[in-house]
């Protein structure tokens, strides 16, 4: 009962904080918040510089694949556990998901820098 109460309180508090953070900024929307600020001086150039969307997508793809590789780092220690068959099955599924994601990105030309 104590564990269920703790879990319920944590989930309720998290949902309350997320909803407050979502709706609070919408109450005070005015144009001054959207303007750039450079220590009280007039901006030297435009603060809304365009950037390459391809660069952004490749960076996000790298972060996702890097996170999946980081999940495999404790694999040598996990193999020595009592259920190594389960460990190898889960790691094989993780590597398969990584390979399928890479194949999907490759087929959709997500890794092509020039078009």
Curated annotation (Swiss-Prot):
Xref: Pfam families: Oxidored_q4
UniProt enzyme class: translocase
Entry EC number(s): 7.1.1.2
Domain of life: Eukaryota
Transmembrane segment boundaries: 4-24, 55-75, 84-104
Gene Ontology CC terms, in alphabetical order: mitochondrial inner membrane; NADH dehydrogenase complex
InterPro entries: NADH_UbQ/plastoQ_OxRdtase_su3, NDAH_ubi_oxred_su3_sf
Main localisation: mitochondrion
One of the record's GO molecular function terms: NADH dehydrogenase (ubiquinone) activity
Catalyzed reaction equations: a ubiquinone + NADH + 5 H(+)(in) = a ubiquinol + NAD(+) + 4 H(+)(out)
Location in or out of the cell: Mitochondrion inner membrane
Alphabetic keyword roster: Electron transport, Membrane, Mitochondrion, Mitochondrion inner membrane, NAD, Respiratory chain, Translocase, Transmembrane, Transmembrane helix, Transport, Ubiquinone
Topology relative to the membrane: Multi-pass membrane protein
GO BP annotations, alphabetical order: mitochondrial electron transport, NADH to ubiquinone
Subunit and interaction comment: Core subunit of respiratory chain NADH dehydrogenase (Complex I) which is composed of 45 different subunits. Interacts with TMEM186. Interacts with TMEM242.
UniProt similarity note: Belongs to the complex I subunit 3 family.
The protein's role, per its UniProt record: Core subunit of the mitochondrial membrane respiratory chain NADH dehydrogenase (Complex I) which catalyzes electron transfer from NADH through the respiratory chain, using ubiquinone as an electron acceptor. Essential for the catalytic activity of complex I.
This protein's name: NADH-ubiquinone oxidoreductase chain 3
Organism expressing this protein natively: Necromys lactens
């Amino acid at each position: 009962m104590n564990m269920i109460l703790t879990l319920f309180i944590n989930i309720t508090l998290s949902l309350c904080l997320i909803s407050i953070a979502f709706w609070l900024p919408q109450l005070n929307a005015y144009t001054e918040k959207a303007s750039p600020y450079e220590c009280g001086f007039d901006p030297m150039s435009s603060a809304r510089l365009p950037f390459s969307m391809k660069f952004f997508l490749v960076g996000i793809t790298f972060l996702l694949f890097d996170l999946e590789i980081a999940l495999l780092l404790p694999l040598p220690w996990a193999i020595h556990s009592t259920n190594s068959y389960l460990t190898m099955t889960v790691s094989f599924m993780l590597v398969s998901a990584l390979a399928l994601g890479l194949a999907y990105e490759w087929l959709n030309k997500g890794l092509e820098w020039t078009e």
